[in-house]
Amino acid sequence: MASQSDLMELDMAMEPDRKAAVSHWQQQSYLDSGIHSGATTTAPSLSGKGNPEEEDVDNQVLYEWEQGFSQSFTQDQVSDIDGQYAMTRAQRVRAMLKHAVVNLINYQDDAELATRAIPELTKLLNDEDQVVVNKAAVMVHQLSKKEASRHAIMRSPQMVSAIVRTMQNTNDVETARCTAGTLHNLSHHREGLLAIFKSGGIPALVKMLGSPVDSVLFYAITTLHNLLLHQEGAKMAVRLAGGLQKMVALLNKTNVKFLAITTDCLQILAYGNQESKLIILASGGPQALVNIMRTYTYEKLLWTTSRVLKVLSVCSSNKPAIVEAGGMQALGLHLTDPSQRLVQNCLWTLRNLSDAATKQEGMEGLLGTLVQLLGSDDINVVTCAAGILSNLTCNNYKNKMMVCQVGGIEALVRTVLRAGDREDITEPAICALRHLTSRHQDAEMAQNAVRLHYGLPVVVKLLHPPSHWPLIKATVGLIRNLALCPANHAPLREQGAIPRLVQLLVRAHQDTQRRTSMGGTQQQFVEGVRMEEIVEGCTGALHILARDVHNRIVIRGLNTIPLFVQLLYSPIENIQRVAAGVLCELAQDKEAAEAIEAEGATAPLTELLHSRNEGVATYAAAVLFRMSEDKPQDYKKRLSVELTSSLFRTEPMTWNETGDLGLDIGAQGDALGYRQEDPSYRSFHSGGYGQDSMGMDSMMDHDMGAHHPGPEYPVDGLPDLGHAQDLIDGLPPGDSNQLAWFDTDL
């Protein structure tokens, strides 16, 4: 039974001038909400320390209260209490508070007592007197810390609605803090989450995100976090209430634990929702998130922030914004962090961003770290590192140079050797090697380095089963580049590269012919690769290999000339060009020139003299002249007239300028963009690492802007066309720099 001293203690706790008596449970510390401890928010508690107050202080306060009310109060005793405070309205209010508190403290499983206490507290929260409302809010907050009374509160929709309404409408800081704290305590339970949701608590909590009081902010964000994690419909409600904009605005705060919860809320809201990603972008989210990655060292914050960036990195609108904000460099700072989950998230995000970062400056540190990560024992790390390197070396002269200088060739070759038949690793690694072996100052060194580090056997092996078409396509392009180095001609031949290239060419050509005969008009995709691309790539690789006399003998011995002549009739200009190019090389040998003529090549070659692509026309002219070596002078003269009228049909002086011969194939290739939100690496079955949507032109790694032949393309003035050898001398030497397949992210 309660004594007079017990009642005095309760009365003192509620006096306005005695607020200090409960200040020890008003600490403004930060909330865990499951982020910092790793705990979930399932009932009965989200974490080991779910309240902002210290547990020992809580226990002390509740202990003191329980000491005073350890026995149940009878109705007579409650009536005595009422009698003592019946003189004024304020005294009656205090009496009502005591009555409600007594009932709630005694509440265990007695639904009748709860039913009697809750309406009284609810009425007080709705009182017009703000002093009364404040006292009620303080009391409800204190009671919400005790499990029994907390359940009584959450099971009353009227009470929860009153708490939400009071929090939203009050101008009193203490009232706002207590009501927000009460909702936070309720959010530890699924029943409480549902009650908050049904009472319209989410718009009210979003409104509180604009509070200037830190403790209110902490309660609001952690309660919203619990709702987002466990309450169905909460995500949409937060979006509709403008929560995304409010949360992005809070990213300029400096408390790392608060930021960790806020960024996790953003990740939950943005995942799988394009509209949310665009709202984050419009609110300045990318820059703020990158700033966090650049500024802080708290692992949990870096991890949650990297998760948001990972989700945003698959959005085509957010991707360039993150890159421009310095996202690549900021993420690269954490690739050597001891936290593997942070490293993996940064790598996934970098991989997603890398196709939009091919022109970024200041990537030296990142590239060096990525080359080191190729030696990791973690397959996911190696896979991502290879993919990022492939994209960053596409169309970027400086990045190619840097990767070569830090041992990238050796590291990539070793990666391919270690990967075996794991195409999610070998394909991006081969793509990166293809980029590094062409169109930069150290390209020849790179071509040699692949051989010196024992890479040729494994590269040729990848042309064979079980390799799938995306990997084969990348490998063919690499072999073409390796053939630019004369020292690789014999080793490639000895490894059996030529017969396999011919086999692939024949198979791909047959597939295209079969489709055409069946009335198909669109190009055929097999595992995300067009068979026309394989035809073009294999023919182009054979073209470069045919510079070697011994390779020409092997190529001719495989009965390829009829097929090359047939390819001259292809409706695809790129294929016409590589077919004319390989015939041009083969025609250096008299026997081959005769075989080419015997296959009826004169007619299609003569037709190609009128091609709008000057590269095609030039190769066709060269083949015709080589075929005419043993023809009568009269025939040569007529051919010279035909060539003159064809090749000089427009502006003859352009042949004396270092202009575009038309040997370029068109649009530049794009680096591969990752669009899946699943962090797992894209498999070749869904389109392959090398899938793109740019057509055959995208197989090249052109420089941005207008193309110019460059030092590998001396374009001399076309001499007297009556002399065959002079025409040959006027050709670009082997078309070494402008063939498709040699440098792109496939």
Positions of PLM-derived features:
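Short, hydrophobic/charged alpha-helical patches characteristic of ARM/HEAT alpha-solenoid repeats
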Residues: 105-116, 120, 131-132, 149-157, ...
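Alpha-helical scaffold repeats of the Armadillo/HEAT/TPR superfamily
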Residues: 116-117, 154-163, 197-204, 239-246, ...
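Intrinsically disordered, low-complexity regulatory regions
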Residues: 1-123, 128, 137, 510-530, ...
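Alpha-solenoid helical repeat architecture
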Residues: 125-128, 167-171, 209-212, 227, ...
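Alpha-helical solenoid repeat architecture
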Residues: 44, 93-105, 120-124, 135-149, ...
